[in-house]
From Swiss-Prot:
Belongs to the TPT transporter family. SLC35E subfamily. It is a multi-pass membrane protein. One of its GO terms (biological process) is blastocyst hatching. This is Solute carrier family 35 member E2A. Its main location: membrane. It comes from the Eukaryota. Keywords: Membrane, Transmembrane, Transmembrane helix. Pfam families: TPT. The keyword Transmembrane applies.
Length: 405
């Protein structure tokens, strides 16, 4: 290969000289799924038209996780707040749906409208320790992306409320125990996140422990089970897409921004459905006219505000950790929710619940160790690659072809 051809390699691979990937994207979702197109560069040699050099950059287009991950101070604060607001929202939802005979679609509408209005205030009015910065540019498929994520978000909320209305809290959380494995698959397909064998194996006690927590749950309902499983899949897909938007290199959204845009998109998509299919004055299962007393309105507004805080803290935490780590943290939250439901709603404690909790705790510890080992291994590989960059690129070109040209 000529000297001119060799000089092109560092220029193309320089991180500061990133260009948009050439070629046409498939439909309008190419930028979301095509994470590898921005990491691979083809360069032609001057000596032969058949000669080509493949350069793979090390920098990912999506920052999967920071160095400390969930153990950073800010991530721990977000995690604690997310747990707290999630518990408050969960039990208030159960109270409204069970004791007040509320409809899931009505409660979902209140939650989405509330979080949209509060998010609008936070975006356009400087408040709540958040100063919104005006964005100069948006992704080319911004509207379609937000509509898609917003639809998934609303579907997750409504399906979760349907499962909560038809089955016990503990059973709904048990069905969600398979979330980590769905997240591993989707994160690999969409973000290109690599999880090693040890990390994948550590997820088994996490999922199995949560399933054991309520293995004797007898309030099985096919509608509630189907809704809980659908919520699980939709939530994993939404989390992976949200991570792509929160941690992208070129277009990165803050947690309040993403929360507001997706909520507004969900409301815009589903206003016709609410108008034609919901009978607002009659929302009780018994069909009686619902009385909007001051206490009921206060409960609904409180539920909407708590749901907003839960969503914002979840997005903020998601921006700091990987989707798989977020899924493991969510599994821990589900296990704690089971024990809190036992305390609050008086469900019986079983030996399997205790064993399951121990397994979840052990699985989380194993996951942290496996994750740390994987990060150290990858860091050592990157260090070795940076010390001898030419040794990694030379074998990509046949030795004899460089001698003849």
């Amino acid at each position: 290969m000529s000297a001119a051809a060799k000089s092109q390699v560092p220029e193309e691979a320089a991180p500061g000289c990133e260009e948009e990937p050439k070629g046409k994207t498939l439909l309008t979702w190419g930028s979301l799924f095509g994470h590898r197109s921005e990491k691979i560069v083809f360069t032609k040699g001057d000596g032969s038209p058949e000669e080509s050099l493949l350069t793979v950059t090390i920098t990912e287009t999506t920052v999967i996780e920071s160095d400390l991950g969930v153990w950073s101070s800010r991530a721990l604060i977000y995690l604690t707040l997310w747990f707290f607001f999630s518990f408050c929202t969960l039990f208030l939802n159960k109270y409204i749906l069970s004791l007040l005979e509320g409809e899931p679609s009505m409660l979902g509408a209140v939650q989405m409208l509330s979080t949209t209005l509060i998010g609008c205030v936070k975006i356009f009015v400087p408040c709540c320790l958040y100063q919104h910065k005006t964005r100069l540019s948006y992704p080319p498929n911004f509207i379609m992306t937000m509509l898609f994520v917003g639809l998934m978000r609303f579907a997750t909320v409504v399906l979760g409320l349907v499962s909560l209305k038809n089955v016990a809290v503990s059973f709904a959380e048990t069905v969600k125990s398979s979330a980590p494995i769905f997240t591993v698959i989707m994160s690999r397909m969409i973000l290109g996140e690599y999880t090693g064998l040890l990390v994948n194996l550590s997820l088994i006690p996490v999922m199995g422990g949560l399933a054991l927590c309520t293995a004797t749950e007898i309030s099985f309902n096919i509608l509630g089970f189907s809704a809980a499983l659908s919520t699980n899949i939709m939530d994993c897909l939404q989390n992976v897409f949200s991570k792509k938007l929160l941690s992208g290199d070129k277009y990165r959204f803050s947690a309040p921004e993403l929360q507001f845009y997706t909520s507004a998109a969900a409301v815009a998509l589903l206003i016709p459905a609410w108008t034609f299919f919901m009978d607002i004055p009659v929302i009780g299962r018994s069909g009686k006219s619902f009385s909007y007393s001051q206490d009921i309105v206060l409960l609904l507004l409180t539920d909407g505000a708590l749901f907003h805080l839960q969503s914002v803290t979840a997005y903020a935490l998601m921006g700091k950790i990987s989707p798989v780590t977020f899924s493991v943290a969510s599994t821990v939250k589900h296990a704690l929710s089971i024990w809190l439901s036992i305390i609050v709603f008086g469900n019986k404690i079983t030996s399997l619940s205790a064993i399951g909790t121990i397994l979840v705790t052990l699985g989380v510890l194993l996951y942290n160790k496996a994750r740390q080992y994987q990060q150290e291994t990858m860091q050592s590989l990157v260090t070795a690659t940076s010390r001898n960059p030419e040794d990694d690129t030379e074998p990509l070109v046949p030795q004899d072809s460089r001698q003849h040209h």
